[in-house]
Swiss-Prot record:
GO CC, any one term: cytosol
Family: Belongs to the UPF0250 family.
Transmembrane segments: none
Record-linked Pfam families: DUF493 (PF04359)
Identification of the protein by name: UPF0250 protein SO_1163
Superkingdom assignment: Bacteria
Amino acid sequence: MLNTKFDELMEFPCAFPFKVVGDAHETLTDRVVAVVQKHAPGDYSPTVKASSKGSYYSVTIRVTVTSKDHIETLYTELANIEGVRRVL
């Protein structure tokens, strides 16, 4: 697991925004939502922005998280999506 201090800084459950930056591919948003659904089922409407040159997409999704471990698991799983460069 990651060594974060989310449990010291936040009260759970809470809405937590994840920003996933990856290669511009039409399925990136669907893959992000699929990973989130696996760990936090719900109805999600992520926002997507393309980079200035169109090479990358930024997908922002707000997820209700229940613990530090929940956040860390989502960070890890989202980072493992093919084509993802960063998870913020």
